[in-house]
Amino acid sequence: MKKKLLWLLLVVCVVIFPLTAKETKAETEGDWKYSYDSTGVSIDAYNGTDENVVVPEKLGGKDVVAISCYAFSQNETIKTVKLPLGVDYIGFSAFSGCNSLEEITIPSSVTVIQDNAFRNCTSLKTIEIPE
């Protein structure tokens, strides 16, 4: 009886777990490396050289909803960043070590800013959060 129950449990796990997994795909568009799933796009890296960066509202036709951990980390070039309305998450150390970053505009849609998101941003003077 115990063996049958264990086998049944194993079969249920094998069938159910793949159904609950979130499929994430990675892409590159211009200077942006990003991943996406059914909820939207997460910016994984900015590979450009602009000093004034405006994060696009959409990439690959999908809404940008998150800035991933370390996405801009250690970027010595950027001075200003503007995030689009719709972004609701800024990941751990997303902008850490951006020594030239002076100003960032964070939309009111952001509900989570993880630890160390702006650690060692020694030039950061202005954080604007429009209503």
Q: For each predicted feature, which ranges?
A:
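Sec-dependent signal peptide cleavage junction
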Residues: 17-30
